[in-house]
Amino acid sequence: MIRFLVFSLLILTLFLTAPAVEGDVSFRLSGATSSSYGVFISNLRKALPYERKLYDIPLLRSTLPGSQRYALIHLTNYADETISVAIDVTNVYVMGYRAGDTSYFFNEASATEAAKYVFKDAKRKVTLPYSGNYERLQIAAGKIRENIPLGLPALDSAITTLFYYNANSAASALMVLIQSTSEAARYKFIEQQIGKRVDKTFLPSLAIISLENSWSALSKQIQIASTNNGQFETPVVLINAQNQRVTITNVDAGVVTSNIALLLNRNNMAAIDDDVPMAQSFGCGSYAI
């Protein structure tokens, strides 16, 4: 009897101390600093399995089986209210989120697949009336990304909106969420711009938007360059601090050496390209090129 009790207590201890899900990362707005936000984004990048590194940039895996394909991000606002966000670790796409006993998923095939593995114990599942690409989100929000503030206070507001699910502002909140997590993980410049706004908001420059819209193209050309003496097969156009279009043709460019932090696997390009808006606008910025 005593042995049984000891064994039972041991099992219970192991259960209580085990991590919830491998790869989970968390960020709390209360007491947040530029440094703590940077640690959060660094931990998010570390939670993404990669195939190998090209020019010291992790190349994300092309696929993973079942639940291994997803990781959770736990975000807590100033009011101590938490939402859990599910991402696809092969492309850092947000699939949906959970607030309390309710899960919310984008209206797309990839999110439907994710729902088989994450938030399965939620008592209620809501399918959002739009997919997760920016074009659809901007239509639902009635505004473009350039007019939606970013910064840690904006992230706090986004968490609150999603926690209580305000349908009128959910699409805008999701764009703030995506840029504050996925896009910041993809680009050091976006991480830095958001992280240094601890107590104020800012409107994203069109240069930020151009980086976001160019992730697939840059990833593809960097992979091509790895077997082409560092040269791009097709140039990628970005914008410099003088609001001028700059053509990136090789891996010596600053956006490659000191900005992009993750590479989308070429095997996943078709699905991502389908989600990039056809019309891309560009503007000024200060990232290294």
From Swiss-Prot:
Reaction equations catalysed: Endohydrolysis of the N-glycosidic bond at one specific adenosine on the 28S rRNA
Pfam (any one): RIP
Keywords linked to the UniProt accession: Antiviral defense, Hydrolase, Plant defense, Protein synthesis inhibitor, Signal, Toxin
Stretch forming the signal peptide: 1-21
Gene Ontology BP terms: defense response to virus; negative regulation of translation
EC numbers, comma separated: 3.2.2.22
Entry's family note: Belongs to the ribosome-inactivating protein family. Type 1 RIP subfamily.
This protein's name: Ribosome-inactivating protein karasurin-C
Organism: Trichosanthes kirilowii (Chinese snake gourd)
Higher taxonomy: Eukaryota, Viridiplantae, Streptophyta, Embryophyta, Tracheophyta
